[in-house]
A protein has these predicted regions:
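Bacterial Sec-dependent N-terminal signal peptides
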Residues: 1-31
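Extracytoplasmic cysteine-anchoring/structural motifs
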Residues: 21-30, 39, 77-181
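Structural beta-strand segments of beta-rich domains
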Residues: 34-36
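Structural motif
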Residues: 39-49
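Solvent-exposed strand-loop boundary residues in beta-sheet-rich modules
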Residues: 44, 61-63, 106-108
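Short acidic, gly/pro-rich beta-turn/loop elements at beta-sheet edges
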Residues: 46-48, 67, 112, 131
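Extended low-complexity, serine/threonine- and proline-enriched intrinsically disordered segments
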Residues: 49-66
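Solvent-exposed serine/threonine-rich low-complexity stretches and specific carbohydrate-binding patches
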Residues: 65-80
Length: 181
């Protein structure tokens, strides 16, 4: 009787051991849905990178802007500001269009200095299976050049030209669009 009990216990342990799977954990280094990478350049000398002063980027339908300073509190307005020469903007994965309002000098109370331009990005999406733990990511293909909407506040646009460098958005390691101002 003792032998039968030992055999049953050994079989039970073996079944439990071999029935286990390794943990599915999505590594932090796993590529995810890439953002649209934009670089700002001097319009009169295109070889020079140019930082945008106090830029905010707000997608249509959003109540707050894109977070550029994740270390700041969600109540701190500087969380949504950048003065960099490169930014990354997320695109909607549920549609084929995303519209952003890019506001230069957004903290200024002087309307002559504060300037906003609306840009519409048109694209197609492609879902890519990454792994069971990570699920899917979405890649984008820009269709045509981004469109600047007419400025309803005034006729002054701060963006002079928009050039698509890489229409296939599969990684954040390359510049997809250059904006000249």
């Amino acid at each position: 009787m003792n032998k039968i009990l030992n055999i049953i216990m050994a079989l039970f342990i073996a079944i439990c051991f071999f029935g286990c799977e390794k943990d599915d954990i999505c590594s932090g280094g796993t590529p995810t849905t890439p953002r649209l990478m934009i670089e700002f350049r001097e319009k009169d000398n295109p070889s020079i990178l140019k930082p945008v002063t106090n830029l905010t980027a707000v997608a249509t339908g959003m109540t707050t802007g894109v977070v550029f300073n994740e270390g700041l509190s969600s109540t701190d307005p500087n969380r949504y500001l950048t003065s960099a020469n490169k930014i990354g903007l997320p695109l909607k994965i549920t549609g084929e269009t995303t519209e952003y309002t890019l506001t230069q000098n957004s903290t200024s109370t002087n309307p002559a200095i504060r300037n906003e331009d609306k840009i519409v990005f048109n694209y197609t999406t492609k879902e890519i299976y990454v792994s069971r733990a990570c699920g899917y990511k979405t890649n984008f293909d820009l269709t045509g050049s981004p469109v600047q909407e007419p400025n309803t506040v005034d006729s002054n646009r701060w963006i002079s030209n928009i050039v698509v460098e890489t229409p296939n958005i599969v990684t954040e390691n390359e510049i997809h669009i250059k904006i000249y101002f």
